[in-house]
Each structure stands twice: as C-alpha cells, then as structure tokens.
C-alpha cells in the first residue's frame, strides 16, 4: 500500500476523526495516539482488499546503482531530537535502489502523533540531481543512534529499512544478520510473500530513558499487523516485540520471529575457491532450547542444493542464529570483522504452542547474499479474520542471554577419508574442567549410514574435549546427532547435523 492509503486508513478510524489527513501537502495538527491505535488501523486494513504500494520515483532516483544510492546521505545535524539532550536520535533513509516503497513516519510526544515531513534539503545527493524543494517523496526507513560505546557520541544501534527487515548491534559490535517482522511461505515451492512495514510511530524518549519505543504497521496481500518494539541498547541490545496479526487469508506457512543471515564457508564446509580467510559467515549455527529442555546446536552449511530442516517442538524456550566463533584468527578479515557480528536469540514470552523451527540453507557463490533463514511456524494455520497475538524478546549480542552450564560445541570439522567422512567436534565449557576423564563418553547416532570409531579425548589447546567419529554413508544425506556424557549425566548440548554429498 502507498502512503495515501495508509493515511486514508488512519483517517477512517473513529477514534481519530481528523487525524492524519490524506492530503499529504496540507499542514497537519498533532493527532491523538495510544498503543491501541496501530492495532485498530491494522484491523481496519485487514477488512479490505490489499492494495499494492505505489513505488514510482523520479527517474534520477529510480535507476540508481549501489554506489549512487550510498552517496545519498542524511544530514546528521537534522536528526530527530538532535540538540534536545535526549538519549536517542533518529536519522532517515532516502528512497531509491532496492528501497522504493515509501514509509510514513510519525513522532509521538505527549500522547500526540505528528508526521515527520520529508524535505530534500535534509539530504546530500552526491552526483544525483536533488529533488525539487516541494517534492514529497517520503522516506525508505530510519536508523536509531544512541551513546552505546562512548557517552559523548551517538553510534548507530539499529536500522529499519526494506520490507519488514531490521537489525541491531550491541556495544562494540558491527552489523551482521537481520530480523524481519514476519515471513510468509519462505521456502515454499510457490514463492515467498514479502510483507511491508508501511508506517512507523517513534515515541519521544524521556531525558533519562534507557529505551525507545517504535510502533509499526505491517501490510501485505495476506495479512495486516501491528507491532510495538521496545529497544534497549547495551552490552546486549534487547528488543521487546509485541505483535498482533490480522490475516486476510489463512496463513499456513507464517514465519514468526524470522531471522536471515549469511554462511559462505567454515571448517565444516570449506570454500572450493582459494581464499586467504579460513571462515566467512555472519552466523555459524542455529541454537534451539526446546520445550522439552533439550539444547540443540546445528552448525550451518552452504549446501549444493536447497536444504530445509524442521525441528518439531511444543512451546520453545529460545531460538537463535548464533556467531560462536569470536577469534580474529578464525577469519583473518580486517575489513569485515566477522568475529564482531552479533548473535540473535529470540525468546518467546508465553506459550507458543505446537509448531516447528524451520531452518533454510540456500546455496550461494558469493558472501554478499543472505542464504540462511530461521523462524518458528505454528502447527495450526493463522486463521483469516482473527487476531493472533505473539510476544517475544530479541537479544542482539555476543551470546544467549542465559548461557547454559552444559558444554558447547565450538567447532565442527569434516574430512573426506576414502569411502567415509571423519567428523572432529571440539567441545568447551567449565563443566568439563572437573569431569572424571575415565567416565567421559561420546554418544553418536545417524539415521542412515554406519557410525564407527567414536573417540573422546581431552583437548589441551582449548581446555575442553574432542569427540571424533567416522560416518560411512549409505545415501546422499544423513541426519547425525552427537553429545558428550559423563556416566549417566549429559555434559554437553546436543549437536545435530545434516550431512550431504
């Protein structure tokens, strides 16, 4: 939907009779706002047929290449709340390149919402001709700045840009993987539907606030939705996410708390080409803390063919795409600094019922493409004409919010040895420092193929243990499980892996 359609929907809400007039050029008075407003708008939208957004732009902006788009910069002196001595500032992105959809953005202060007007003189355009001063092109998205690393400097801590994508960093980190508001039909043969955030409401923070609140309106062919993000930057940057979905049609393959990342190569899946870097990835594994209390670790891969894995569960406790390898030596990349990229852990609040954690691994020949997706799909489709409410917490940072006492699999290595594959798994954790070495054993299984030569031994280089075994394949793919035990006590999480030719 376009900006005028958003404004028309807003004006149709009885609570806001004169709010958000459809005439975008007319001066606007602040309109009453409370958290229920966005849900009302979403519910109203869902009751009507979807209207696709108008993506028209002046030709000078519609045909930008990557470098020309990057040259368009927002003037930080014009940032929202600049000079107000507040703990957050907001800068805006111009439309162009991949980001042709306009989003309407409001500031909320003292219970009133006021649209933030687009002005071309807030931007520098490089070699691209600037739009005329009276142009009303809208924004593509925004980024949030806060003094996360130094008390006197506002670093970029989060970005909302493109479809329903957003991402964040914690203190001392660089951007890496992204989250999305919702995914629909991801990995399905009929193709994916991409919902859009079409409007945002930014609550003005108090002078001593440690968090910022962002409301978002989602719209798509199949669903409308309302979101509330409470964002707390820090050593771990935390998003509290409250969402209400109003499907126009039954959603059989809705992805909740979707994440998208990149895995190009690593020790379990090395590069076919010569590369000075041992590893290249934004995330190296999927972590699951399931409803049965089991903790799973699934190393990521860059497969030859599309791979879709499903982990059935009831009321999951946590799901994350993690970057466990933090050492520079593992990457050797001074520019990309993959070891400083965040892990993302999604913690459901309340019961999510039955469903599956979906992991999608897409073949890629370039590191510039996100080829990993993970999300939760409810077993029961989200029915049309209903309200479906979910709450969860996102943790962007170096680790899960509550590290387990169980030892972790820190590295997965695989070698080809004739007709079999040698797996070498390193495991680290404080629990292993006081273990009875004579009682340690590895438990390994495969759904297809033969497992032989299971060996466990201390690893003096890591202070942990090493578990190795041979797999003799019988088919082009096998599902593997491994864990470390001391007698009848589990010492480690459960390593799960799909081996493919």
Curated annotation (Swiss-Prot):
Pathway: Glycan metabolism; osmoregulated periplasmic glucan (OPG) biosynthesis. Residues 1-24 form the signal peptide. It comes from the Bacteria. Its main location: periplasm. It is found in: Periplasm. InterPro entries: Gal_mutarotase_sf_dom, GH-type_carb-bd, Glucan_biosyn_MdoG/MdoD, Glucan_biosyn_MdoG_C, Ig-like_fold, Ig_E-set, MdoG_OpgG. GO terms for cellular component: outer membrane-bounded periplasmic space. Gene3D superfamilies: 2.70.98.10, Immunoglobulins (2.60.40.10). GO terms for biological process: beta-glucan biosynthetic process. Keywords: Periplasm, Signal. GO terms for molecular function: carbohydrate binding; catalytic activity. Involved in the biosynthesis of osmoregulated periplasmic glucans (OPGs). Belongs to the OpgD/OpgG family. This is Glucans biosynthesis protein G. It comes from Rhodopseudomonas palustris (strain BisA53).
């Amino acid at each position: 939907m376009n900006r005028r359609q958003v404004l028309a929907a807003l004006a149709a809400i009885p609570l806001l009779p004169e709010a958000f007039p459809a005439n975008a050029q007319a001066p606007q008075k602040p309109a009453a706002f409370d958290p229920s407003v966005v849900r009302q708008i979403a519910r109203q939208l869902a009751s009507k047929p979807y209207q696709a957004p108008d993506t028209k732009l002046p030709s000078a902006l519609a045909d930008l290449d990557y470098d020309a788009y990057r040259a368009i910069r927002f003037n930080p002196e014009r940032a929202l709340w600049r000079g107000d001595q507040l703990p957050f500032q907001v800068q805006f992105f111009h439309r162009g390149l991949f980001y042709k959809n306009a989003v309407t953005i409001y500031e909320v202060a003292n219970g009133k919402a006021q649209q933030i007007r687009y002005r071309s003189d807030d931007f520098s355009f490089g070699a691209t001709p600037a739009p005329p001063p009276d142009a009303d092109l809208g924004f593509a998205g925004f980024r949030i700045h806060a003094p996360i690393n130094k008390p006197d400097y506002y670093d970029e801590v989060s970005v909302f840009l493109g479809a329903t994508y957003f991402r964040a960093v914690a203190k001392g980190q660089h951007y890496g993987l992204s989250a999305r508001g919702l995914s629909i039909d991801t990995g399905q043969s009929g193709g994916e539907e991409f919902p859009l955030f079409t409007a945002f409401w930014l609550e003005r923070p108090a002078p001593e606030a440690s968090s910022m609140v962002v409301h978002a309106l989602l719209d798509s062919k199949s669903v409308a939705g309302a979101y509330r993000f409470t964002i707390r930057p820090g050593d771990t940057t935390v998003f509290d996410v409250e969402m209400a979905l109003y499907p126009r049609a039954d959603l059989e393959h809705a992805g909740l708390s979707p994440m998208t990342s990149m895995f190009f190569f690593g020790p379990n899946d090395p590069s076919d080409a010569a590369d000075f870097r041992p590893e290249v990835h934004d995330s190296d594994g999927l972590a699951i803390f399931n409803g049965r209390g089991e903790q799973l670790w699934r190393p990521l891969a860059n497969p030859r063919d599309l791979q879709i894995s499903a982990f059935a569960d009831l009321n999951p406790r946590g799901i994350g795409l993690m970057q466990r390898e933090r050492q520079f030596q593992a990457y050797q990349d001074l520019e990309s600094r993959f070891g400083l990229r965040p892990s993302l852990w999604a913690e459901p609040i309340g019961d999510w019922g039955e469903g599956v954690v979906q992991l999608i691994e897409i073949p890629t020949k370039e590191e510039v493409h996100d080829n990993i997706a993970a999300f939760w799909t409810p077993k029961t489709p989200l029915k049309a004409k209903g309200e479906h409410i979910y709450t969860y917490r996102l943790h962007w940072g170096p680790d899960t919010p509550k590290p387990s006492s169980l030892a972790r699999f820190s590295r997965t290595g695989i070698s080809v040895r004739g007709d079999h594959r040698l797996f070498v798994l390193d495991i680290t954790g404080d629990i292993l420092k006081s273990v009875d070495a004579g009682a340690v054993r590895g438990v390994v299984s495969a759904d297809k193929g033969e497992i032989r030569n299971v060996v466990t031994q201390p690893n003096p280089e890591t202070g942990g243990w090493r578990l190795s075994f041979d797999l003799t394949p019988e088919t082009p793919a096998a599902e593997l499980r491994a864990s470390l035990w001391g007698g009848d006590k589990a010492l480690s999480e459960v390593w799960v892996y799909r081996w493919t030719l």
